[in-house]
Amino acid sequence: MAPRSLYLLAVLLFSANLFAGVGFAAAAEGPEDKGLTKGGKGKGEKGTKVGADDTNGTDPDPEPEPEPEPEPEPEPEPEPEPEPEPEPEPEPGAATLKSVALPFAIAAAALVAAF
């Protein structure tokens, strides 16, 4: 039977490898993959009200002109089917199955060896 310190060492190695692997995988994803970006998109400015003196003496309610009849739209041509895109290359430093599974395998081997 192995001494108690060997069991504690195995558990410590397991925990260290586990946290290192999970931390590496989370850091490799990066904040841009989670939609956290600096600045916002689509935030327009609010409109300003026009005062009575800004109308330049024009009639505020002009009579609407009759709408012309819409021309018939030509039939759209069928678009050719797009070619399938090749799989993108993984980014350098991105988490892969190998980079995540390796710490688990090392930790499991350490636990098995200790017991």
Swiss-Prot record:
UniProt keyword ATP-binding present: no
Region (Disordered): 27-97
InterPro entries tied to this protein: Trypano_PARP (IPR008882)
Location of this chain's protein in the cell: Cell membrane
Sequence repeat boundaries on the chain: 59-60, 61-62, 63-64, 65-66, 67-68, 69-70, 71-72, 73-74, 75-76, 77-78, 79-80, 81-82, 83-84, 85-86, 87-88, 89-90, 91-92
Primary location group: membrane
Annotated stretches, region: 17 X 2 AA tandem repeats of [DE]-P: 59-92
Gene Ontology cellular component list: plasma membrane; side of membrane
Biased composition (Acidic residues): 60-90
Cleaved propeptide residues: 94-115
Database matches in Pfam families: Trypan_PARP
Membrane topology per record: Lipid-anchor; GPI-anchor
Sites of GPI-anchor amidated glycine lipidation: 93
Residues of the signal peptide: 1-27
Record's keyword terms, sorted: Cell membrane, Glycoprotein, GPI-anchor, Lipoprotein, Membrane, Repeat, Signal
Biased composition (Basic and acidic residues): 31-52
Residues that carry a glycan: 56
Function: Major surface antigen of procyclic forms.
Record protein name field: Procyclic form-specific polypeptide
Species whose genome carries this gene: Trypanosoma brucei brucei
Lineage: Eukaryota, Discoba, Euglenozoa, Kinetoplastea, Metakinetoplastina
